[in-house]
Each structure stands twice: as structure tokens, then as C-alpha cells.
Curated annotation (Swiss-Prot):
It comes from Chlorobium phaeobacteroides (strain DSM 266 / SMG 266 / 2430). The gene is rpsL. This is Small ribosomal subunit protein uS12. Keywords: Methylation, Ribonucleoprotein, Ribosomal protein, RNA-binding, rRNA-binding, tRNA-binding. Gene3D superfamilies: Nucleic acid-binding proteins. Residues 116-135 have a biased composition (Low complexity). Part of the 30S ribosomal subunit. Contacts proteins S8 and S17. May interact with IF1 in the 30S initiation complex. Residues 101-135 are annotated as: Disordered. GO terms for cellular component: small ribosomal subunit. The modification 3-methylthioaspartic acid is found at residue 89. GO terms for biological process: translation.
Amino acid sequence: MPTIQQLIRSGRSIKASKTASPALEKCPQKRGVCTRVYTTTPKKPNSALRKVARVRLSNKIEVTAYIPGEGHNLQEHSIVLIRGGRVKDLPGVRYHIVRGSLDTSGVADRKQSRSKYGAKQPKAGAAAPVKGKRR
């Protein structure tokens, strides 16, 4: 605990808040190029093959980003858009790839939460999505 004299001399320092996604540099999204697309396994107790990509951003920083949704068309040299948001069971993955923008296709046959996965509205002739459960 500082003395009164020490507080007069220097005052209390304000603790700087640390950002969860430093590579974005206060931008909502950043563009990047995939350098490697691969699968990795999550922490215990989960078990899966999670799809991730190593991305070199436009500010020359290289990050690991998660590819959400079922199936993707990404490969090396694909241009992607990155947003913040970590994946809890993948250590070191702090970013998500935005589906349906730049070289990333939207998730095919997606009926619900379409805007999060870049899926277009299904055609009127096709089976309409169920609005609410009827009893």
C-alpha cells in the first residue's frame, strides 16, 4: 500500500484493458489470405475434428481462425474475412471466418440462423422452413 507522499508524487495508475482480439487492431473485420487449411482436435472432454485455417491478415499478422458451419470451400490462397470471437475448446483460436463473404461460400441447405452462415433464403418452391412448433 502506498504512502500519502508516494500518491502525491506519482498518483494511481489506471490499468489498461487488454483486447481479446489484438490482430484486428480495433477494426470490426479484417481481410486475409489462407496459408494453411486443416483440422484439429478440441480440448478434453470434447472430441471432434474442428476445421481451422491459418490466415495472414492484411496487416501482416498471422492468426488461426475457425471455419464455422458444415462443409467449406476454403483452400490455400483463398481470400477470407476475419471477425473476432474465440472457440472455447480450441486453444489459440481467437477469430472466426465470416461465411458468405469474399472467397468463402455460405453453408449449403441451411434453414435456420442463415445470416450467421451466409446462406441465401430458400426458394419459394422448395419446402418452407418450419416457423414454430405446432401442438
